[in-house]
């Protein structure tokens, strides 16, 4: 049986010696992958990333996607990714993303540490009622069977 509480988890993203914690919804429709590495993508609202990324990046995602990367410090430039996507009502969209150091996912049953994932910066709100700030796909949980970079800790 699948209940509403099974649809949510807590996410902590670690990047550049900082961390940000947020509530995430598990989205069965999120099959987004970064095209070169094929890593799964977690979509995160921009406002949930203010502790992790410099304002120069967060406030200029559209400019950066358009090719204006002059404002980016080199230590961030190598971590940034461009992620093409299609969704209902929006074909050929692109999101700016980055490779975090690690992501910790807390569910009712366990805690999982994931290294191989990409975070996409979403400029709008994902939830009208601010119930969550991130969307992650089921494939992140399914990958744990074949991916040695995921560590699971039972509660």
Regions found by a protein language model. Give the residues of each.
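Aspartyl protease catalytic core from the pepsin/retropepsin fold
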Residues: 9-14, 18-28, 63-140
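A broadly tuned "polar low-complexity/structure-edge" signature
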Residues: 6-8, 27, 40, 46-47, ...
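Canonical alpha-helical transmembrane segment with a positive-inside/aromatic-interface signature
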Residues: 1-43, 48-51, 60-61
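A signal for specific C-terminal beta-sheet/loop modules enriched in small/flexible residues
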Residues: 36-48, 56, 124-136
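A short, charged
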Residues: 54-70, 136-155
């Amino acid at each position: 049986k699948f209940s509403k509480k099974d649809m949510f988890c807590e996410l902590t993203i670690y990047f550049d010696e900082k961390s940000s914690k947020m509530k995430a919804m598990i989205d069965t429709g999120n099959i987004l992958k970064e095209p070169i590495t094929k890593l799964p993508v977690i979509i995160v609202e921009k406002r949930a990333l203010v502790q992790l990324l410099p304002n120069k990046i967060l406030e200029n995602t559209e400019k950066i996607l358009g090719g204006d990367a002059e404002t980016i410090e080199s230590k961030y430039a190598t971590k940034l990714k461009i992620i093409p996507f299609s969704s209902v009502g929006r074909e050929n969209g692109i999101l700016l993303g980055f490779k975090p150091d690690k992501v910790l996912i807390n569910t009712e049953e366990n805690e999982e540490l994931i290294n191989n994932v990409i975070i996409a910066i979403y400029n709008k709100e994902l939830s009208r009622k601010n119930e969550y700030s991130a969307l992650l796909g089921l494939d992140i949980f399914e990958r744990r069977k074949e991916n040695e970079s995921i560590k699971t800790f039972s509660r």
